[in-house]
Amino acid sequence: IWEPACGMGHLSKRMIELGKKVHSTDLINRGYGTGGVDFLKATENPYGAVITNPPYKIALEFIEKALDISDEGTRIAMFLKLTFLEGKRRKPFFRDNPPRKIHVFSSRASVAKDGDFTAIPNNGNAIAYAWFVWEKGYKGETVVDWIN
């Protein structure tokens, strides 16, 4: 598994706990994984599945890059705000690259930048999130399910 926006390693560490072999990189060195690696400049994917929580402003670019450099059948999972489904700019992308599955969290999640939950305002920041899962080459209907 390649985790190309590993940050402080929260997602990578959990996957390793689950017995997965994970290659963790990030553009910025935050003390975990290999820093200074610009995923958007990658020309190949030697690690297999891509699983990450990409920077939201360039999430589409992350997905497009992962699909571009991965082999047919490779799975790509991105932790994204549910609102990622919205937008005229992304509509053609979803039409041409339908996710195989979208796993929606049934409860809103609090997500803290760099794992710093003390920075969350008292009124919270609970937002609807989902795991969007692509399989390179898949052209069928997207299945939506819920994570409790």
Q: Where in the sequence are the language-model features?
A:
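Class I S-adenosyl-L-methionine-dependent methyltransferase catalytic core
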Residues: 1-148
